């Protein structure tokens, strides 16, 4: 079916998870909550925004589930709780987040876990930690990368073999639905990225091939970029992703 048919069968209600959730729709204990709400772009927001939305939002979503006796939650976290590193991470790896976003998502995971533990024999919690999610209409990292290549504004920052853990949005959704149907009570935690992960060069070259782009992408020394980021970042560069953390 086309997307138009899908949209016609949905009901959309504006809801701010930073406040108590009160929605005027029928809710039953058999409903399932998919908690996707988050402030996520890093950098791009004041530190407080990550904590206010991601932590308080988790508290309010879990309170809503508690109020109506909902037994199943699927929560999208992130690989950000692992911190910035390129060594292989498993679900058993100790999280060491080093950004407000990563810290807030790890705390949100724990809030959901506490909700499940209150009635561990009845409640089902699935936590997924996706990498960069891409797909039609995402207007995120991959979309910006494409337009950067097309406009001649993208370059390799210091190296071409930077690992970019990622997953296609429909693959992620299929996996979440599969686990929802094949998971009883308890807590499940999954990293959701392609393995082996792709390098930025592989992603760029694949994108160029798929779209017919003939652009040459050059590599700029990391030391030069770091100097520029330290200067430009405080002057408004963070809004464009130009800061030492991104380099």
Where do the PLM segments sit?
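Short, small-residue-biased leader/transition segments that mark boundaries at the very start
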Residues: 2-7, 203
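NAD(P)H-binding glycine-rich loop region in Rossmannoid oxidoreductase-like domains
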Residues: 17-56, 60, 64-67, 82
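Short alpha-helix in the Rossmann-fold core of NAD(P)-dependent oxidoreductases
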Residues: 53-58, 74-77, 104-105, 165
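Conserved Rossmann-fold NAD(P)-dependent oxidoreductase catalytic core, especially the SDR/UDP-sugar
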Residues: 60-100
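Flexible, glycine-rich beta-alpha linker
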Residues: 82-83, 123-144
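Active-site Tyr-X1-5-Lys
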Residues: 98-126
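Substrate-positioning beta->alpha
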Residues: 138-144, 158-181, 187-191
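Mid/C-terminal beta-alpha module of Rossmann-like enzyme folds, strongest
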Residues: 178-245
């Amino acid at each position: 079916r086309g997307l138009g048919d899908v949209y016609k069968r949905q009901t959309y209600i504006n809801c701010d998870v930073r406040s108590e959730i009160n929605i005027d729709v029928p809710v039953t204990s058999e409903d399932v909550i998919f908690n996707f709400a988050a402030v996520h772009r890093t950098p791009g927001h004041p530190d407080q925004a990550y904590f206010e939305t991601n932590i308080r939002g988790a508290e309010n979503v879990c309170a809503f589930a508690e109020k109506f006796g909902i037994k199943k939650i699927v929560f999208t976290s992130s690989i950000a709780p692992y911190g910035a590193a390129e060594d292989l991470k498993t679900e058993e790896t100790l999280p060491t987040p080093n950004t407000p976003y990563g810290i807030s998502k790890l705390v949100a995971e724990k809030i959901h876990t506490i909700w499940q533990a209150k009635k561990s024999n009845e409640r089902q919690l699935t936590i997924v930690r996706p990498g960069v999610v891409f797909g039609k209409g995402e207007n995120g990292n991959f979309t910006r990368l494409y337009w950067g290549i097309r406009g001649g504004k993208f370059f390799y920052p210091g190296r071409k073999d930077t690992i970019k853990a990622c997953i296609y949005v429909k693959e992620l959704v299929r996996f979440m639905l599969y686990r929802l149907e094949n998971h009883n009570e308890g807590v499940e935690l999954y990293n959701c990225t392609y393995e082996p992960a792709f390098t930025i060069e592989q992603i760029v070259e694949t994108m160029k091939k798929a779209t017919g782009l003939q652009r040459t992408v050059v590599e700029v020394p990391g030391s030069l970029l770091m100097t520029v980021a330290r200067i430009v970042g405080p002057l408004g560069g963070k809004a464009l992703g130009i800061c030492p953390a991104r380099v």
